[in-house]
């Protein structure tokens, strides 16, 4: 009885067959597909949309600029252009860089280092830059954005030296020029400006110079009187020396 139960249990066990999927026919020809059936081809031909053709006078004699002028600009570009204009108006230091081949990790590290110095690294498209500075005093910077670029903004112009020190470690960022205190500067002028002393140091030198001027003036006014007093003192001492032997 036990042997019969064991045999029945072995037969009752489920077995998973090995399946292997095979294509019934050869590979599908994607480049030169087989022509569809006549009925299907007729349905496809009937359901194809038909667009009205433009008159030849409009398509031939109308320039490409006139045809594309009717396209509506993306409103998001206007928002970004206003943001660029806001950065330009409220930044006392603006530096323009040409970006060579550089990885995203390197850009991120440079962005973090600049942010610690209150310097903000931004990148915009050339069309957005052109839309932002059109008919403004910043229109002269448009030729700088024909290739890959980035812009650094800062409200503090004294950060120019820190900016050049950070960018010196990244050869992929090439300085083109900048705007400092609403004045357009070239690369060499920007480097020379960074080497100038700070405003507080110059103010201290001016205060020191102004404080030295009154003392120098008083010294010059009293120079003749002091020299005359010294001459009289020497003359009095000589007379006293001459009178002393006579009295003895």
UniProtKB/Swiss-Prot annotation:
Q: InterPro entries attached here?
A: Ribosomal_uL10, Ribosomal_uL10-like_sf, Ribosomal_uL10_bac_type
Q: Which SUPFAM superfamilies match?
A: Ribosomal protein L10-like
- Please give the chief subcellular localization of this protein: mitochondrion
For this UniProt record, give its keywords in alphabetical order, as a comma-separated list. Mitochondrion, Ribonucleoprotein, Ribosomal protein, Transit peptide
Transit peptide range is: 1-24
The record's Pfam families line, in alphabetical order, gives: Ribosomal_L10
Does the record bear Disulfide bond in its keywords? Answer: no
Please state where this protein is localized: Mitochondrion
Family annotation (PANTHER family): 39S RIBOSOMAL PROTEIN L10, MITOCHONDRIAL
Q: What is this protein called?
A: Large ribosomal subunit protein uL10m
